[in-house]
């Protein structure tokens, strides 16, 4: 029987926001995996434990959910006036691919902490006490993100009293600024790729829906909960235990992706699970969060439920929160209308685990909506650091 020895790679397992992922420094990866391509993807798949037909990722670091099947590669930035280049890979659980089409807003909260602790931020920029401003170049979406990381006695402060719904224990607050979050790249173009703040989306054998398509933080399709037969108060099990509902959402997402210009044919959606996201909104209602916490309609401006990688998210994706804040700031979008309409610079929304506040500054310039930045607070913590091992013939 042949035997292939395992290799070990320096890695850090971190929580960022309501997600967890395996973090690497680019130059710690095996040489073949230091460049984009098949070797890198195969390595990350093996690290996380995919593809797994059992859907459990038992033989890897993944947690068998969209929030925990994630990888991050960081390097000293090659961009002027930036500290760190941040590349995010969303690893499919049951299929053999890594989706590089978008960012993870939750893990963004951990990028600054990792960069400081691993020598990617110049030492003269790190205060003895206070906030360290880490300038992040997000390579997937070619955008600048600023993380304000608390420092105590020259070290990253991870513990604190900041509470984040969806995370059990309090931690230190990390404020994140997503600068110019609207997509202006080759895929999707403007913030509103169709040129409209509300469109009609026709989905064969499903129905016709009002939709807001937006490229901000991450490409997102917003629908009205009532049009789908929902209240907006649903928790994970209500949606994720309904295979018919999940298939319907995926079909709507595929047709929406075509209308947004992200793919040319609905058949391409299966290999692009990370983007676009699909979410549904409703006016405030009383509900009980997954933790048992009561959320009153007076606590929030609107309710939002979002799907990631084919399942309802347990809380809210960080990038989708940017999309929510941006859409809420622009009068007439479905998100804005669910929040009561009008102009606003911040919104607090209810999600399955509780509530979240996100701010965005929008203005109309030459008949085009422009958002200068979106702001939200998360937290981050190192869970484990050392080496991750994979069979030497994995890639």
Residues of each region from the PLM?
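A glycine-rich beta-to-alpha transition motif near the start of alpha/beta enzyme domains, typified by
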Residues: 1-395
């Amino acid at each position: 029987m042949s035997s292939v020895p395992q290799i070990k790679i320096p890695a850090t397992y971190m929580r960022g926001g309501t997600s967890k992922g395996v973090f690497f420094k680019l130059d710690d990866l095996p040489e073949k995996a230091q460049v984009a391509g098949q070797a890198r993807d195969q390595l990350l798949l093996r690290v996380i434990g995919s593809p797994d037909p059992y859907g459990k990722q038992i033989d890897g670091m993944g947690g068998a959910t969209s929030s925990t099947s994630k990888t991050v590669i960081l390097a000293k930035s090659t961009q002027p006036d930036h500290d760190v280049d941040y590349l995010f890979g969303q690893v499919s659980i049951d299929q053999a691919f890594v989706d590089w089409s978008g960012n993870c807003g939750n893990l963004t909260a951990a990028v600054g902490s990792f960069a400081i602790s691993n020598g990617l931020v110049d030492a003269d920029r790190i205060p003895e006490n206070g906030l360290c401003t880490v300038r992040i170049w997000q390579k997937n979406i070619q955008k600048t993100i600023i993380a304000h990381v608390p420092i105590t006695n020259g070290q990253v402060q991870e513990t604190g009293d900041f509470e984040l719904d969806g995370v059990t224990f309090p931690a230190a607050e990390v404020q994140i600024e997503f600068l110019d979050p609207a997509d202006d790249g080759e895929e999707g173009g403007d913030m509103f790729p169709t040129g409209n703040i509300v469109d009609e989306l026709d989905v064969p054998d499903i129905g016709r829906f009002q939709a807001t398509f937006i490229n901000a933080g991450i490409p997102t399709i917003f629908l009205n909960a009532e049009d789908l037969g929902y209240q907006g108060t649903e928790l994970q099990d209500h949606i994720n235990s309904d295979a018919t509902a999940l298939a319907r959402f995926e079909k709507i997402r595929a047709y929406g992706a075509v209308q947004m210009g992200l793919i040319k044919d609905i058949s391409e959606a299966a290999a692009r699970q990370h983007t676009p996201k699909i979410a549904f909104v409703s006016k405030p209602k009383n509900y009980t969060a997954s933790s048992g916490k009561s959320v009153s309609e007076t606590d929030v401006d609107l309710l939002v439920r979002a799907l990631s990688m084919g399942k309802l998210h347990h809380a809210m994706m960080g990038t989708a929160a940017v999309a929510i804040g941006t859409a809420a700031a622009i009068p007439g979008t479905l998100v804005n209308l669910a929040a009561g309409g009008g102009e606003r610079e911040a919104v607090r929304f209810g999600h399955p685990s509780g509530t979240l506040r996100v701010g965005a500054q929008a203005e109309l310039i030459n008949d085009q909506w422009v958002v200068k930045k979106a702001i939200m607070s998360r937290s981050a913590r190192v869970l484990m650091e050392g080496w991750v091992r994979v069979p030497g013939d994995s890639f």
